């Protein structure tokens, strides 16, 4: 090979190397795994709550592989709300998200996004992410304090098209509700096994667990029920504190049922308060907000432990379709929890990514 040909090949090789370097710099890669950070958020919205819960709240933040290597790149954010539990679930969700997101980002490096997992448990184990004169203004915390703090601390795409909200059980309830109320803030919602969509099935007086709730005489009794692993008594009482607070009541909340000669009867004024914040009953008044969302999805297990969840999930989807509002509702064989980790990676994350805007 003569010197001129060698020079030509060297120049071509140099150009190819330079172009590859430019491509690597412009496109995020998944050479490193994502990382989970635990941070504290100043929750001014919780100030003055009657349960004595702190105004500094723990939060997990998943940063995708490539976040540190690409300081000029901004990322969309998924706010993922956990469910009601008598134990700690935040760390479990951190592990699920890390595994699912690492796999997704490896396969789709141009669709990397941040995942924020805030604490939603108060001292009665569930805030339901609602504003409450007793439990504190958790809705305001999620949509205000939290979003503002994350947008300030991290390189986010700080607009509607760069935000998603999702959740499981209590968190699924909140994801649908907050998306309806704040469609200017979130672009897409995904609810996994969402509870509390309406006052049906095991939320009604046919559930004998209501007798345990009616027997509670104080907030301390609710906390005792939790230590005794009495899920229903704790969960229903906590929902009452969130949905129908009353500082003058024994458990600082009004209940939708009362006992009358050995049977449970409805308390209409409380039922109205509960149904006002239940997503299935909110649809008619929030059609415009639902239509403003890029996507709405629900999934649930056919064998869910809580009978109201499959029924109300289907009804929610049917109601939206009747109003010509696009929605995805998918049932599968599984209970309330056992398929959720795998479906985070196989269903939720790809759906969320398809409805977010990424920096080019």
Regions found by a protein language model. Name each.
Residues 26-360:
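Non-catalytic cap/lid and distal C-terminal segments of serine-dependent acyl enzymes
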